[in-house]
Design a protein with these regions (language model features):
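Active-site-proximal beta-alpha core segment in soluble small-molecule metabolic enzymes
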Residues: 1-124
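Active-site loop/helix belt of alpha/beta enzymes
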Residues: 77-79, 85-191
Length: 194
């Protein structure tokens, strides 16, 4: 969530869980008093920042390696999601590595809430049937990892795939509140179409 004003508005409507891409965005949410359920969806090695955030908010952090697990544990984080590469190789462990990382996280004193993955490479696939099929393939990697890792959370998706993602327990659709006009090419359910 890049706008604390918008996040506060959503909270007034009953929304309690927020996802952010950077520690700075999480800091903004915390400063705005939105501390119930925050997800830092990108890995960080900044233990000092993690420590400060963990003291002030209920934060879950994405981890995808020994180094990010060690940083989370050293920073006082209590909960993590194992970030799994589902086809966009910018972060996330390989699906086969997820169970071992979950065990490492647990042995480091962290609660493994589940898994997350980001199919960002599919967000702007304009053909809905193709987007649905490719999203299902990406999410099959994630749900298989979830079966191996355990936990209650399967987090993923995005604004461009929320309408075809049937596998996740939570969707990370960050642009949904404003729905940039770029998404009009996808024929997504939108207030502009009502």
């Amino acid at each position: 969530t890049k706008s604390t004003t918008l996040a506060r508005h959503l909270a007034e409507g009953g929304h309690r869980s927020f996802c952010a891409a950077t520690p700075r965005e999480i800091e903004g949410l915390v400063a705005a008093g939105l501390v119930d359920d925050l997800l830092l969806a990108n890995e960080t090695l900044d233990t000092a920042r993690l420590g400060a955030l963990s003291e002030r908010a209920n934060i879950t952090v994405a981890v995808d390696s020994r180094a990010t697990i060690e940083a989370a544990a050293s920073g006082g984080v209590r909960s993590v999601l194992i970030d799994v590469n589902v086809g966009l190789p910018r972060c996330g462990c390989e699906p086969a590595e997820a169970p071992a990382l979950a065990e490492l996280a647990r042995s480091s004193g962290l609660e493994v809430r589940g898994v997350m993955g980001y199919e960002g490479h599919l967000m702007m696939v304009t053909d809905r049937a193709e987007r649905a099929q490719r999203t299902a393939e990406a999410m099959a990697l994630l749900t298989h990892a979830a079966d191996e890792v355990g936990g209650d959370v399967v987090s993923g998706g995005g604004t461009g795939t929320f309408d075809v993602n049937t596998s996740c327990t939570e969707i990370q659709a960050g642009s949904y509140a404003l729905l940039d006009t770029d998404y009009d090419t996808l024929d997504l359910p939108s207030p502009r179409r009502c």
